[in-house]
């Protein structure tokens, strides 16, 4: 096993074969695997509305920008045409977005206390996603692909359905059985 390059270019630290990295958005794939494991066990169905497990996602609204070319012009809301499903979250077509895209939802998310999706939230995923559920969607569920906090909602769903924290579920059900001893939810100092 060989390593190449630098683990830290600024410090001049060389890469080692056993260097540890944050996996960042690769957790999306792991969270999706967790959801599919729960489906295999009959604990949920991807066609289920999210509100079946997280009631705050019931009766959502959708933003209708007053001027689609000007996000600062404000918006009105209309009822969602249907409920957001687990499948919508898996395919990033729920209408949920990220704050950092700078779209019409950015200011609403920030004012509503929704995380930016880049910073660690200290294990408060469900608290944050319940806040998100009370805010309007950017698009009608299932209508538009919009990369966003969908997997964060799925992480909350895994916690609710399994009764375990997401890091514990990952460790007990995925990482340990696969012998992934160097893969952790949080990197120890």
Residue ranges, per PLM feature:
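Active-site-proximal loop and beta-strand segments within enzyme catalytic domains
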Residues: 4-146
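A generic alpha-helix surface/boundary motif
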Residues: 32-33, 152, 168-169
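Short glycine/serine- and small hydrophobic-enriched flexible loop segments
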Residues: 36-41, 152-160
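Active-site-flanking alpha-helical
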Residues: 35, 170, 179
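Mature N-terminal segment immediately following signal peptide/propeptide cleavage
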Residues: 1
């Amino acid at each position: 096993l060989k390593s190449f390059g630098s683990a830290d270019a600024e410090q001049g630290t060389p890469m080692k074969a056993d260097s540890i990295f944050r996996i960042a958005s690769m957790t999306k794939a792991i969270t999706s695997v967790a959801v599919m494991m729960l489906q295999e066990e009959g604990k949920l169905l991807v066609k289920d509305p999210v509100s079946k497990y997280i009631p705050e996602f019931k009766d959502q609204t959708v933003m209708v920008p007053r001027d689609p070319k000007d996000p600062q012009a404000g918006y009105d809301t209309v009822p969602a045409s249907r409920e957001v499903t687990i499948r919508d979250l898996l395919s990033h077509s729920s209408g949920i977005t990220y704050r950092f895209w700078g779209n019409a939802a950015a200011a609403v998310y920030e004012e509503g206390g929704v995380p930016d999706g880049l910073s660690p939230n200290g294990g408060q995923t469900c608290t944050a996603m319940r806040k998100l559920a009370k805010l309007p969607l950017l698009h009608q569920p299932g209508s538009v692909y919009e990369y966003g906090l969908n997997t964060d909602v799925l992480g909350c769903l895994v916690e609710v359905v399994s009764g375990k924290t997401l890091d514990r579920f990952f460790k007990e059900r995925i990482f340990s059985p696969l012998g992934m001893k160097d893969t952790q939810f949080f990197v120890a100092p």
